[in-house]
Structures are given as structure tokens and as C-alpha cells.
Amino acid sequence: MFNYERPKHFIQPQNPCGSRLQPPGPEVSGFPSQTKQSSIVIQPRQCTEQRFSASSTVSSHITVSSSAYPAPQQLAGPNPGQKVTATYNQSPASFLSSILPSQPDYCNSKIPSTVDSNYQQSSVNQPVNAMSSQAANARPTPKTPDHEIQGSKEALIQDLERKLKCKDTLLHNGNQRLTYEEKMARRLLGPQNAAAVFQAQNSDVQDSPQHNPEQARLHVPTSQVRSRSSSRAEANDQDAIQEKFYPPRFIQVPENMSIEEGRFCRMDFKVSGLPAPDVSWYLNGRPVQSDELHKMIVSEKGFHSLIFEVVRASDAGPYACVARNRAGEATFTVQLDVLAKEHKRAPMFIFKPQSKKVFEGETVKLECQISAIPPPKLFWKRNNEMVQFNTDRISLYHDNAGRVTLLIKDVNKKDAGWYTVSAVNEAGVTTCNTRLDVTARPIQTLPAPKQLRVRPTFSKYLALNGRGLDVKQAFNPEGEFQRLAAQSGLYESEEL
């Protein structure tokens, strides 16, 4: 538990008449003539500003001298007393550490900006012999009042709080937090250079304080504080980034190509370099110019393309791609072969198939002749349905002259309809339609003969008188009847 009582060795025995700080001069009190002097070093960087009350600790008879800051003047009294030449660049923590052996030395506190109002400023350059003339008028120091003792307690508490705050500035990993100046130094000089600068400053600060136990005198080294503008200028000079260059390098290149004449062609590649290289194309040593048929495209991340809208025979040859920048150049070569365009002709009917009408059971042929380069593919449809070839009844024949024959055996009524023939090749398509009608075969019948009636007497007299036939022949009815029947095609009636 913390004890707020004032340490006994911290409170010096006082004169019953009280003590007052006097202007610089020789001591008249009964203290030893030899005065102790303490040394304090002021760091260029201060972390926190603390208030300091000079009346809390000045009662100890210590003579402190400094050449960098003015000393307090004497109080408004006729009797000059003790000689106190104080330097106010000393923090409360440093002052307590000089008195209390157990207290650590703090070097990161600021110079107290104010002192007790009972003191007045005096010139530092005041001669020492002028101070000795006031030694005879020194009065005995009065007793320190209680409010001054209470102020010293508050200073001690503030010193302990400052110690706790310094511990709080450490991070969890044990690294100390960077101040604004350290951050700026790291940004301008880099982390390694900044660390080296601060280590050099810390080593100089640790070596600079010199404490003489015999004289106990304060030596304050005057260090020139570097201004922010000059530090930035030096950092900019040291941290100047030198521009770097990298020669071109092809990461991706196209392979040799063979393209048919009239087709589209594209060559893609990727190149890197710093700064970005300029790309040029050459065909047989002559630069390739961008026009309607040749285009050069540059995309992001170093991708380039050479495009041929329509490949011509004159585009064939070795292409050299050259990439240049300040650091150098790189080259690759690709071969482009252009194949001659084949002569093509769309299919054309020399003669078309004719419509036909056949009887059931007959064999029919649908013939046509087609001319095309290259030879076309043929498709036959019946009523918009594909015709199945290579069956027992239906077959397709064609020759090199372009004659095409669709043969249908044993035609039936199912084979009737509209037939469409299509010829297709790379150059085009042609079609033609024809009609096939199938009818039933008719049945042939003979008409019935007409019957005639003939009298036999007539035939007898005719035979005797007209032709002079034999009596026997004249009276032979069967022979006459057969003759008449053969001439007229008549048959003998059953009624006779």
C-alpha cells in the first residue's frame, strides 16, 4: 500500500525563523560551506509535460548552476539569504531521483514551464562577487509551511503516475510505441536508417551526462535541435528513388501458322518491360503498316495482337516482332503460310427429275444430273420425310459425271407423293421437286358374241342355183352352217 507521508530524509531541518529563497549570494546559515551540485541532461524529445512546484523541494540546501536558463530572482525582502542558482530544464522525476536514491532517473519529461510565483527572474550572467555583497544581509530561512509540504507530496504522486504512464506506453509484444518524430523519420529515412539514427542519439545521450560525486555539479550539454524542415530536406535527398529500367522480355509468343487465303488470322503475344516497350512488325525486313486489312491492337498487362481481316497470298512470309524501350530490345519471328484458295462452284442441275405416273407393281426411276465443285452431298425427301436408301426396293446410284438415279422397285401407293432432291457443298445449295403418281393396274374382259338365226332352205337353193354346187353339198346343212359361221363369227343356235 502506498504511503503518502513525506520521507524523513526528504524533509530537511528548518530554521525556526523560516526559509526563503534569496538571490544568488554566499550562504550565511549554519549549513556546511560546501554545496552540492547536481547534473541533469535534457533530451531533445519529451513525452509528457509535467508541472513542477519549486517551493516543494527547494528547501534542501543545494546549489544548482546552469548557463542555459535564467535563475530565479530574490524575494521582496531586504535580507539576502541562501545562494540558489536553479536550472528549470530539470524535470520533477530527475530532481527526485537526485534526492531519493531509490527513484529511477527519468529523461523523457519536459522542462517545467512555471515556477513558484514567489521567485523573480534574474540574469544568469550576474557576477558572483556581486552576490557576495548581499551575504551579510541574509536572514535565517523560515520554516517550510504545510501547504509546501503538501505540494511536494503531490509532486511525488505525479512522479509515480508518470512512471505508470511510461509503463503503459509499452505494447503487448514489448516494443515501445513510436512517437510522431520516429514515424516521420521511418517514413523519410526508412526503418533501418531511422533506427540507426535514434540508436546513435540514445548512445550520445547516455554518454553525455557526467556526474562528479565530489562537486555534484550539473553539466548540461547543449545539443542543437534539428528543425523539421531541414530534416525533411535531408531525408528527401537521402531517400531519392532512382528510376529503374528493365529490358523487354516476351512472355508469350505465337506459333507458326498456315491459313487458307481469304480467312481471318490473329497473332497474340505478351511482352513485359519498364518502361512499357514499343512494338513494331516487319515482313521480309519491311515494316507492316496498319490499314483496313491489318490492325495492331494493344491491350492491358502487355498483351498485343496483329490481326489480318482477310488473308491474302501477299501476306505469306516470316514476320519479325521487335519490342524496344530505354533498357534494350527483344525480337521473335513467326512464319505465316497462306494456302491457295480452292476453286469452288455451287451445285447446279444439268437436267432435273421428271414427274411420272406408273401402275402398282412396276419399277420406276427418278433421274437427274448435277454439276458442282467439290462433289455435293445428296438428300432425297418424300413428302418432307427422308427417304431410306439401300433397301430391297429403293436404291440410289450416282456416277462421276453427276448423274443421280433413285430406283424404286415394286411401286405401291405408299411410294406416291412429292419428291425433293437437295445437293449441298461448301459453295452453296440447290434443290428440285418432282411428282410420282401410282395407280392400280386395270382388269381386261371379252364382250359376248351376237347370235343369228339362218334358214336351211335358203342355203340349199343358193348352193344349187348360184354356184352349181353338188347336190350332196347343197343338202348338207352342217357344212353350210360352218362356212357361214366362219364368215360371220356366228354360232349355231340351240333352238334349231
UniProtKB/Swiss-Prot annotation:
It is found in: Cell membrane, Sarcolemma; Cytoplasm, Cytoskeleton; Cytoplasm, Myofibril, Sarcomere, Z line. The modification Omega-N-methylarginine is found at R20. Belongs to the myotilin/palladin family. Residues 213-491 are annotated as: Necessary for interaction with FLNC. It comes from Mus musculus. SUPFAM superfamilies: Immunoglobulin (SSF48726). Residues 78-149 are annotated as: Necessary for interaction with ACTN1. This is Myotilin. Its main location: membrane. GO terms for molecular function: actin binding; alpha-actinin binding. Residues 1-37, 202-239 are annotated as: Disordered. Signal peptide: none annotated. It comes from the Eukaryota. The gene is Myot. Residues 248-333, 347-439 form the Ig-like C2-type domain.
